[in-house]
Amino acid sequence: ILDDLDSGKLAFDFGCEDIHMFVEQVLTQRLGDVGKKLHTARSRNDQVALDLRMYLRAEIDEITGLVKELLEAVVAQAEANKTVILPGYTHLQRAQPILFSHHLMAYAMMLLRDLGRLGDCRKRMNVCPIGSCALAGTTYPTDRRFEARKLGFDDIARNSIDGVSDRDFCVE
């Protein structure tokens, strides 16, 4: 379905309430009544929470990769400029002579902290809400840990209400 949407073979039906109903409709058209089972042991609440976490996880991974590339470039420039001397400033005044490489490595240290923050955020965010349903779980015998592993999550939400309502990771 995603490939068909991306290629233009399929257009979103704005008559559907949201993307979840659209996907269910297309699956039902393509597979018959079994497509209606997509919603079994699922709620839009846990699906939206899942989608948001998966989206942000991918964005964090993308940003992490970009920061690593920048870090490598900064370190390479520091290596290439080990003997370049320039004035160091404090209070808008020249203070001491410093090496350009030392100045660049200050930025490398900042980028390393940023990588740590991104990693910490990813750890807290990479919790799977699937199975929380609307807010109180499901009576269907689902294997939440299996689903979480298959979707690339490190853990499952320990509390179903928190699983569908938690958005503090977005602030990070």
Q: Model-derived features: where do they sit?
A:
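Glycine-rich anion/phosphate-binding loop at the beta-strand->alpha-helix junction
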Residues: D114, L118, G163-E172
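A helix-coil-helix interface module used to build multimeric assemblies
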Residues: I1-G137, P141-A157
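Short, charge-dense linear interaction motifs
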Residues: I156, I161-V164
